[in-house]
Amino acid sequence: MKHITNLFETLPMSACVAFGHFDGMHLGHQAVMEKLCSHLDLTPVLLSFAQTEKPVIYTEREKEYLLEGTGVEWMVSAPAKEMEAMDAETFAREVLAKALHAKIVVVGENATIGADAKDAAALAALGEAYGFTVETVPTVCFAGEPVSSQAIIKAIEAMDFPRMRELLGRTYIMQGEVVHGKAAGRKHGMPTANLGVAPNKISPPHGVYGTLSHMDGKYYRGMTNIGLRPSDDDIPIPTVETFLLNFDQDIYGRQVILEVFVYIRGVKKFAGGLAEVRKQIDKDIEQVRTYMDEVIRKLEA
């Protein structure tokens, strides 16, 4: 799959296009992508409205990772502000028809298009003028409720990982580059990988989690701390740092996909010094190891 950020780069001349925020790449979005990729005579193109300021479940890089293997051949990331500022007709003419060469456009049945908030029927009428047809996808529901980004955000904030998996259709992920931190983990005898994540990414509440880190086609069990480290007073900013079990390699600069599976405990300050910290860490590691061993057993079954 090709991922570009320039709408006017050379694109296929006959495309099937889906557009929107696709925040969460959840079951509803997956239904749209399935329809998008069903037209074998057209090139499937996904236009993602990229947010750089508003909070998001998934960044553009994370969306790219999740699109691999779906059948989508082109992902185009365009600034959300620019896309949303256009009225529906301008968007249909300049973006869908001229830039993306759309022959078929796939939208959810309740989609709104443009700054003037036109519906799918209005887009279909515009398509008659600009050379494309519109296909709608029914709303996807789970347990009687529409699957939505808002429902997923509530699950993230509540640390409801089973609910997240149900709505996302997979485990919640965080993606980023391993960056140099303060090396605070080393003084506790457990060097950690510090993940540089986008500042506008919606993360689970501060705490300790059981995770899998994906690098170069392999995955590694880990214990991840999201948030402040109250026992290290010189580190006042939130971090995402992972202690990888049975792993001792230099991975600075590597891209990591972090799957977050389970909440272990909240962040707390230890007054008893390094011995107390180490005792708690050992307890956490054993809990993470037990849980993640079962996760891996199921993955490899």
Task: Identify the meaning behind each predicted range.
Residues 63-78:
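A glycine-rich helix N-cap at a beta->alpha junction
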Residues 26, 67, 105, 164, ...:
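Residue-level signal for inorganic ion chemistry
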Residues 86-192, 214, 300:
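Classical nucleotidyltransferase
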Residues 182-301:
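Phosphate/ribose-recognition catalytic cores of enzymes acting on nucleotide-derived substrates
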Residues 6-61, 65:
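N-terminal catalytic cores of NTP/NDP-binding nucleotidyl/phosphoryl-transfer enzymes
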Residues 16-20, 46-49, 75-79, 104-109, ...:
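Short beta-strands and strand-loop turn motifs
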Residues 1-8, 76:
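Short acidic-hydrophobic, aromatic-tinged amphipathic segments that line or gate anion-handling sites
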Residues 23-24, 50-54, 81-83, 110-114, ...:
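Short histidine/acidic/glycine/proline-rich micro-motifs that form metal-
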